[in-house]
Regions:
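FIC/Doc superfamily catalytic core
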Residues: 1-87
Length: 87
């Protein structure tokens, strides 16, 4: 199970679009689930335990995963920073 859920990431994305007024809505939820699974695999199978490394995985994987129509990099950055903030 992901430390950060797809529902949370979608909420972050929607808030970014609302606040900035820039970008188009739309999410490929299956792609997003795959992105989050990739992070889980790194944590559990490659023993990634460092919080900063996990945060980096969130930022990079969400940005490169292109689960959203617009705002992937912004969402990746915001999710990464939020993850660090709540830890």
């Amino acid at each position: 199970m992901s430390l950060i859920t797809s529902t949370f990431v979608i909420a972050v994305h929607d808030e970014i679009l609302k606040e900035t007024g820039v970008g188009r809505e739309g999410c490929h939820k299956d792609k997003l689930e795959g992105v989050l699974s990739r992070i889980d695999q790194q944590m559990y199978y490659n023993n990634v335990e460092d919080l900063f490394e996990i945060a980096a995985w969130y930022g990079i994987a969400i940005a490169k995963g292109h689960a959203f129509v617009d705002g992937n990099k912004r969402t990746g950055l915001a999710t990464m920073l939020t993850f660090l903030e709540i830890q």
